[in-house]
Amino acid sequence: MDRIILHCDCNCFYASCELLSHPDLRQLPVAVCGDPTERHGIILAKNEPAKRCGVKTAETIWKAKQKCPGLILLPPHHRLYAEYSKKINAVYGEYTDLVEPFGIDESWLDVTNSLHLFGGDARALADTLRGRIKREFGLTISVGVSFNKVFAKLGSDYKKPDATTVIARDNWRDIVFPLPVGDLLFVGRSAQELLGRYGVRTIGELSKCSEEMLETLMGKMGSQLYRYANSLDDSPVRGAADREPIKSVGNSTTFRRDLTRWDEVQSGISLLSDSVAMRLRRYGLYCGGVQVGIKNSRFQVFSRQTTLDHSTHLMREINDTALRLAKDLWKAPDPIRLLSVTALHLTEEAQSYRQLDLLGTDDTQQEKQEAVESAMDALRKKFGRGVISYGVSEDSLSGEKIERD
């Protein structure tokens, strides 16, 4: 028996949350951005009127203003988005215990074993969810219904806003095959360009490629994309009971040549801290501690950790702490073979806290950095991991592979 999977995607989530406090702006073009006073800031989200003007997520403010001179800019409020995300997922949890969040504004639901309790009609259940989210929170969602996770996500992207799309056994080729290959889950800009060089521009064209050819071209990802394009995805929806609590998030890299200079160590720590912070944000987690590990050329391993005075998922804060630990730990110029950065003492986003600064300067700076890193996440989600990085020298890391712990 086929599974029944729903993918629920909040429409223009950041912008929609902000407009709850500004209902008078609902019919006007509005965008959420890091710093509305900076021309070179990045658009984090936009509402439908702004979208109709051609405004795009991850483009610069000045470019968006050129397209839409009347664009209204609002600053982000990340704690607000986290609160709504938690409430919305709680609604999903009333229909199945198999709810798997995918970022702050998307979730998969496996209703295979619970659908009969709610009428037995998957489309009707999707419409019920859309109605509840709109009535209870003033937000809209699009829902994809299918027999696997990949097609359910394609369905939620297929019609927006506030729509339900069913991709079933009898129509999936008609809907899926004409779509650009870049619409497929985990196909970033670099993968799309690589496939394009071989004449593969649609999911239908991808489905006709041999699995062996794709694996030769792209490694394990090629085999995965072959399965996705041919309706063979069987990945489970992991509910909270199936997901082991994440106790730490770490990344490491073993260098092809030993590091002996501090600027090389800085580059390595920064790259690792960026990867750790990005994963924390994706999981909706904050860390309350940081650990740095060093393996020298004699394969001796040293580590040091510290507890933070507040929880964070920001690269800058993790990186600053990791650099201090590395500086204390490393006995220069002892050659370094491996570096690792690990986030410890993890808490859910809604449980995080920050000590208050009486002048408010810490909170202001935190919001600005939240905006910067959210913008980077948006760029990477749209164009791929390598589209943007922090301004550190990475000559020593060229071609190095970052490993997840």
Model-assigned labels for residue ranges:
Residues 1-227, 237-240, 278, 363-405:
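Gly/Gly-Pro- and Ser/Thr-rich, intrinsically disordered tail segments characteristic of DNA damage-repair
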Residues 7, 183, 191-336:
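DNA-contacting surface of Y-family translesion DNA polymerases
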